[in-house]
Amino acid sequence: GTLIGQDYK
């Protein structure tokens, strides 16, 4: 859900 399409937790 961040930047491009990668989700960081």
From Swiss-Prot:
Subcellular location: Secreted
EC number in record: 3.-.-.-
GO annotation, biological process: DNA catabolic process
GO molecular function terms noted in the UniProt entry: endonuclease activity; magnesium ion binding
GO cellular component, one term: extracellular region
pH dependence: Optimum pH is 8-8.5.
Assigned keywords, A-Z: Hydrolase, Magnesium, Manganese, Nuclease, Secreted
Activity regulation information from UniProt: Stimulated by magnesium and manganese. Inhibited by zinc and aurin tricarboxylic acid.
Oligomer status and interactors: Monomer.
Function: Involved in DNA degradation in the substrate mycelium. Cuts DNA nonspecifically. Possesses endonucleolytic activity.
Protein name: 34 kDa extracellular nuclease
Organism whose genome encodes this protein: Streptomyces antibioticus
Lineage per the UniProt record: Bacteria, Bacillati, Actinomycetota, Actinomycetes, Kitasatosporales
